[in-house]
Amino acid sequence: MQSIFGTDGIRGRFNEEITYSLAYKVGYALGSTLENKNPILIGRDTRISGNILLQAITQGINESGKKFINLGICPTPAIPYLIKEENLSSGIMISASHNPPEYNGIKIFDHNGQKITKIFENKIQKIIEESKQNISIPTKVVPLKANKDLMDTYIKSLIQTMDGESLSGLRIILDTCYGSATTCARKIFQSLGADVKVINNSKNGLKINLNCGSTNLEPLKKAIRESPADMGFSFDGDADRVIGIDSKGNVLDGDHILFLWGRELMEQKLLTNNLLISTEMANLGFENSWKKIGGILYRTDVGDKYVHDAIKKKRSVLGGEQSGHILSKINNFSGDGILTALQISKYCKKKNINLNDWLKSSFEPFPQKLTNIKLGFNFNKLNPENKILIDESIKNFQTIYSENCRVYIRPSGTEPVMRVLVEAKNHEKVDSLSSEITNKLFLEIDKIRY
């Protein structure tokens, strides 16, 4: 059996890759594996399938002899924070993050609030493989009561990260993309004194991430044009990532956030070895500018768990991804979009600078082009010979690397596509190189018989 775990837990379309039976087995396997007898914390985003999967997982946990606490709809980072705070045995988040509504997923956290290790994944996988049960969706799904007190504990923890700094006088627009941030983003920013407007703020599992949120910034840009604001923040479905927009509609992505936040820490002598951790997707303009001010950028494979591992290994205090996953020491390196948005707002208020001017002081990004080549098959399921052939082609293309040009190619961890990233100092070079590489790689992939 192929591993059910990808780069960020278990992910797939509901009733296809992610079934009621699989969710039940995950709950049972987790409960059976844990020696710690404290309850398992469970949360979910707003997807329609979330409540059904919650029912399945809790059924499995119950039959394993363990107990659970239902947090209800919540941001993913609430789970790891509360595991540590309440001394719980582990946690599960039911979410497919930024993916469309028909997808869902299962993220598992250990007793330290960290994503489980490969060894732990293998233990769960083994129990699932040995199970012969095929559990069907019950005719009636009974809603489970959510623990509101724990959610309030998480909200208070975010407010406390502001160290008493008020956001009064700041006009901020939030796009909660019909997802997890709908539960608390408005409340948090308003409690800090900000003048807040929120769009896409209903808990709608059919609309989550659809033409909104951190992967589609047009609704937020439009809102800022129509209702002038100092800044805006757009979250993804489970609120573990965020992208900012300044008053002029310019984008503050994860690279800009890392540069600006990192520079603040560097100036305060709080950035260990002047080191930032990011991934192979980080913009070359970011890397070059960071080096010019004395910083070091360490790149990892794509995925916040790889960033997290490198942060621990290199003893860094800040890292993240261009997509808006930012991991900081403030909350034990758990990506939290609301926390990140609060910190950006706090710096602007303390420095008495608008986000537009602060963003101008960062770096000029190189033009980038990201192309997805549809594979029609799961790359990880290819036979070794064909996989080696494609890997060799990728290596050859990626040798094109200098201060002015870079190519990065990888199979997606969540979709059957090959991602081709090309960046250079001008758009013409990017377009021509991207077209050349994409066409050649497509022909190589098309030769594969699987």
UniProtKB/Swiss-Prot annotation:
InterPro entries: A-D-PHexomutase_a/b/a-I, A-D-PHexomutase_a/b/a-I/II/III, A-D-PHexomutase_a/b/a-II, A-D-PHexomutase_a/b/a-III, A-D-PHexomutase_C, A-D-PHexomutase_C_sf, A-D-PHexomutase_CS, Alpha-D-phosphohexomutase_SF. It is an enzyme of class 5 (isomerase). Its cofactor is Mg(2+). The keyword Repeat does not apply. The lineage of its organism: Bacteria, Bacillati, Cyanobacteriota, Cyanophyceae, Synechococcales. Catalyzes the conversion of glucosamine-6-phosphate to glucosamine-1-phosphate. This is Phosphoglucosamine mutase. Belongs to the phosphohexose mutase family.
